[in-house]
A protein has these predicted regions:
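N-terminal nucleophile
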Residues: 1-322
Length: 322
């Protein structure tokens, strides 16, 4: 969660401060988190007035883990809109004026998108295509579809995944993307002795990731396949080749997946594969293990002229027996 909070406070990403603006010129953020040990999940969608939506999602998960109340009320796992904002205040989470989340850069992007959309609508011979795809293209051109995601494993072998996003630029108010949807934005199952653990998060055009439930698809594949094959098949067959996206011309998506195959003592004496893949032009990844002196950063980029629309890369760690 701390990683997501850091990037939500960083105005160059599309999460928290600096998020894409809605048609109304406001910020509405989505976020979710999943704990691989308990398999609990917490999410918020179309949330206004909160600097760090992932903290609200984490609190939702925390309350869910407490179970039903004395009256038998089932705690929510997903809150949206004004209800999510009120719930956050009731639980002591920090709120802020909506204007605090808007930056000069996000305003300029919004103005550019509005002008282009109005120009497109007034054209006599406009090419018929999905309006959503137009918005996704505009977001990608402005390098502003930077969904924030994180996957991690602690020293006990417990895995967790989280994701946060401001959504596509010029989205309809109330629109919710994959970052808040179960199985689409993040997924995690914890490592047990002699078992496989997986944590996964996604990025890209939310509607497409929701239709394909990409986080769950890739994580499920990784339980029986190596991490590279899981991401290749997930993004290739289950995303680019999905029948649910057959009418979509430009399928924008990315996956970050952590796969752990352990010995008899969980996080001790295990192999950790960190793999990322994307169909977008680029994807930025940072990672660090306990034995590393400092984080490593990689800007993965599909070169111009590359015929394969999908790029998959990764790294491997071997955690010794303690």
């Amino acid at each position: 969660m701390c990683v997501c909070v850091f990037f939500q406070d960083f105005p160059c990403t599309n999460a928290g401060i600096g998020s894409n603006l809605t048609k109304s010129g406001t910020v509405e953020c989505d976020a979710s988190i999943m704990d691989g040990q308990s398999l609990t999940f917490g999410a918020v969608g179309a949330l206004k007035g909160v600097r760090n939506p992932i903290q609200v999602a984490s609190k939702v998960l925390e309350e869910e883990m407490k179970g039903s109340s004395t009256l038998g009320l089932i705690p929510p796992i997903f809150l949206a809109g004004e209800g999510a904002f009120q719930w956050a205040m009731e639980h002591g989470l920090t709120t802020c004026p909506d204007g605090d989340l808007i930056t000069e850069r996000s305003t300029q992007t919004w103005q550019k998108c509005k002008a282009r959309l109005q120009s497109s609508q007034s054209a006599v011979h406009e090419h018929k295509r999905c309006r959503l795809e137009n918005l996704c293209d505009l977001s990608n051109e402005d390098d502003n579809m930077d969904t924030v995601g994180a996957v991690c494993m602690d020293t006990h072998g417990h895995l967790c995944a989280g994701v946060s996003s401001g959504g596509v630029v010029y989205k309809t108010p109330g629109r919710i993307g994959q970052a808040a949807v179960y199985g689409s934005g993040c997924w995690a199952t914890t490592l047990e002795a002699n078992q496989v653990g997986v944590a996964c998060c996604t990025s890209g055009c939310g509607e497409y990731l929701i239709k394909t439930m990409l986080a769950n698809e890739c994580a499920t594949l990784a339980l029986t396949k190596d991490a590279v094959s899981a991401v290749q098949q997930g993004l290739g067959d289950r995303f680019l080749g999905s029948t649910f996206l057959s009418s979509v011309e430009k399928k924008l998506g990315g996956v970050l997946l952590l796969r752990v195959e352990g010995g008899a003592e969980g996080a001790n004496d295990c192999t950790v594969d960190l793999v990322w893949g994307h169909t977008t032009q680029s994807m930025c990844i940072g990672y660090m293990a306990e034995q590393d002196e400092k984080p490593k950063v990689r800007l993965s980029r599909i070169e111009k002229g590359q015929q394969d629309p999908l790029l998959v890369e990764g790294t491997v760690y071997r955690l010794p027996h303690r």
